[in-house]
Structure formats: structure tokens, C-alpha cells
From Swiss-Prot:
This is Lipoprotein signal peptidase. The chain crosses the membrane at residues 12-32, 70-90, 102-122, 137-157. It comes from the Bacteria. Pfam families: Peptidase_A8. One of its GO terms (molecular function) is aspartic-type endopeptidase activity. The gene is lspA. Keywords: Aspartyl protease, Cell inner membrane, Cell membrane, Hydrolase, Membrane, Protease, Transmembrane, Transmembrane helix. It is a multi-pass membrane protein. It comes from Escherichia coli O1:K1 / APEC.
């Protein structure tokens, strides 16, 4: 039995496109205006810093000889497909879940594009306190983390709020 896409969670796929445009646009600006390793202070504790990540979060498996590029690409594709199916099976009114899934898909596809096109992920956000620097990350990573946090938040909401 088929149903209208607008009645399913796929109605929220526009958010995937927004995340992709913002993420890929920011990476394009970095690639066009920064040399690898360049840093520009934005605010106290926040820099723009061009870095390349050949691995995953925190450069996990970055020095593994290249196979990790395809491994992480496969994971991104798999997760995106699974979440799209979950969106299709959910109602459009289940906003929190669908927004979370769309953010994760958008972030995963943004980093997937980098892996396939460049062979690495472009990172540029450098958060620091004093001499301690958090791992450099990008807007796709931020979308993935916000999406994951929304899924966790949804788990704590009362049943009535989950349906909306």
C-alpha cells in the first residue's frame, strides 16, 4: 500500500538539502581561501582552521592506508539508507525524529561527498580553551551530533510528545 510522501517523514528531506548546501558551501569557501593549516581567529576560543581528516571522528583510522575511505563511505551510505527508510515509515508529524534523521543524513552525505571527491573530509572549526584544542570539525559533523542529540532527547520525552 503506497502513501503520499508528504504524509511520511520524507516530507523533511528538504532539511537534508539545506544541510548539504551549508556544509558543502562552507567547505568550498575554505578550500578556495585557505591553504592547508591556515588559521583565522573568529572569536575568543573559536578559529577557522583548514585541516584534512582522512579518518572518522577524532581522526580515527586516519593512518590506515586508504581502505578506511571506502569503509566510512559504506557506513555513510548504509546509515543514510536506513534513516531514509525510517523516515518513510514514520509520520510527517513526528517532527523531532524526522528532523534528527534529516540532520544525520545531511551530515553523512556532506562528509561522504568529501571522501569520494577529495579523498578526505574538510574540517575547519577549531574550538579551544587556553592551550587545549578540541578536534577540528565541520558543519556536517555538527549536524550529525545535533541529530544524535535530538534522538537521545526524544527518548526522554513523554509518549504524547514523541508522537508530535
Amino acid at each position: 500500500m503506497s502513501q503520499s510522501i508528504c504524509s511520511t517523514g520524507l516530507r523533511w528531506l528538504w532539511l537534508v538539502v539545506v544541510v548539504l548546501i551549508i556544509d558543502l558551501g562552507s567547505k568550498y569557501l575554505i578550500l578556495q581561501n585557505f591553504a592547508l593549516g591556515d588559521t583565522v581567529p573568529l572569536f575568543p576560543s573559536l578559529n577557522l582552521h583548514y585541516a584534512r581528516n582522512y579518518g572518522a571522528a577524532f581522526s580515527f583510522l586516519a593512518d590506515s592506508g586508504g581502505w578506511q575511505r571506502w569503509f566510512f563511505a559504506g557506513i555513510a551510505i548504509g546509515i543514510s539508507v536506513i534513516l531514509a527508510v525510517m523516515m518513510y515509515r514514520s509520520k510527517a508529524t513526528q517532527k523531532l525524529n524526522n528532523i534528527a534523521y534529516a540532520l544525520i543524513i545531511g551530515g553523512a552525505l556532506g562528509n561522504l561527498f568529501d571522501r569520494l571527491w577529495h579523498g578526505f573530509v574538510v574540517d575547519m572549526i577549531d574550538f579551544y580553551v587556553g592551550d587545549w584544542h578540541f578536534a577540528t570539525f565541520n558543519l556536517a559533523d555538527t549536524a550529525i551530533c545535533v541529530g544524535a542529540a535530538l534522538i537521545v532527547l526524544e527518548g526522554f520525552l513523554p509518549s504524547k510528545a514523541k508522537k508530535q
